[in-house]
Amino acid sequence: MTTSGLQRLARQTFGFQQLRPGQEEAIRAAAAGRDVLAVLPTGAGKSAIYQLAALIIPGPTVVVSPLIALQRDQVAALVANGVDAAEANSQVRAADRRQAFDDLIAGDLEFLFVAPEQLANPEVLEQATAAKPSLMVVDEAHCICSWGHDFRPDYLRLGAVAEALGRPPILALTATAAPPVRAEIVERLGLRDPLVVVRGFDRPNIHLAVERFTDGDAKRRAVLDRTAEAAGGPGVGIVYA
């Protein structure tokens, strides 16, 4: 697909006026069947990478996501844009979960969102395997890091899960991954010659400064002055002290 074609797909399906830095190369690599690790800051459009790549690749996509609320938000956003998607987690009725897998196997569902713990269930894994997914997405991939505060033990099984699924291309996404964490993600997931896309985390809209005050009244006045200056007029704000 040409750049203009990809831009058109993004615009027509999701209303994106243009792709952000790092998105196109990650989408192209995943759509070409290559493993990808994309490290982009929050708000940089990680979800768009797997959504657009999956729409280019024929066949269903299994998205591993650690939070039910996140799964629900992603499903709602996809459905709102006319894309067939469902979640199959512990808060979904058993009959609806079965229907979701039936739809995935029948080719009537583009995206199925599951938690890593569910894929430890042999029955769930068997159903996912029967769907022959063409792409496996691992969201919040830093959860695989064994020494991180977000560590989820079931993420360690995802490399084996990918093999059981027929080893589709793996697209791993995270906003939090220093070089050692990236290396662990690649190793634990068994990524093969992955494209690693890392984009800057500079936030020009965020300003950090330190000022020292020995007088409490002066400190309070400074906080009020800075708050009023930042607000640019009457409004509501939060001060962490």
PLM-predicted stretches and their roles:
Residues T61-Q71, A230-A241:
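Conserved strand-helix element at the start of the C-terminal RecA-like helicase core
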Residues G59-N81, S90-V92, D96, A115-Q118, ...:
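Conserved Walker A/P-loop ATP-binding site and its immediately adjacent core
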